[in-house]
């Protein structure tokens, strides 16, 4: 637990939250500033500032709980679908303000005001191939990488 972390304080019971679900690794509770009706946050019980520093098993548990919450919010609120949002930044990009790994489960409705995250435009194929090559090259030094790495980007 990190003393100055709001989500750690919720996990420990120091701060109240409208708890929806919990298991040995995760908690799911209602967002106090919801983007849409039924907006749920899923957090690991153990503090990790972001997905890159989280224990793999904690991340998998968060993903499983987020998947379950997605089913629940679609069923309970008759949402048309969900967005799962997980931000990792130092706060200077992406508007992240809570530095405890969490996933937003955002029910989507035809009349919500969330819009789209980006305007998809087809990129130059050579730029896509170069980006893939850079990722594979970087991935070769990652101790968590699994073989075989993609061969199309070599």
Where are these regions (language model features)?
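HIT superfamily nucleotide-processing domains
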Residues: 1-154
């Amino acid at each position: 637990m990190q003393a100055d972390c709001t989500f750690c304080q919720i996990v420990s019971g120091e701060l109240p939250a409208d708890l929806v679900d919990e298991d040995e690794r995760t908690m799911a509770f209602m967002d106090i500033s919801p983007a849409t009706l039924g907006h749920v946050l899923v957090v690991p019980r153990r503090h990790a500032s972001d997905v890159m520093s989280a224990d793999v098993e904690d991340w998998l548990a968060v993903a499983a709980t987020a998947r379950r919450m997605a089913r629940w919010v679609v069923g309970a609120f008759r949402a048309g679908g969900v967005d799962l949002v997980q931000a990792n930044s130092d706060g200077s990009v992406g508007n992240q303000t809570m530095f405890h790994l969490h996933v937003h489960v955002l029910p989507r409705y035809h009349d919500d005001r969330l819009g789209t995250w980006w305007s998809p435009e087809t990129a130059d194929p050579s730029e896509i191939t170069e980006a893939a090559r850079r990722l594979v090259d970087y991935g070769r030094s990652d101790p968590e990488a699994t073989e075989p790495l993609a061969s199309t980007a070599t």
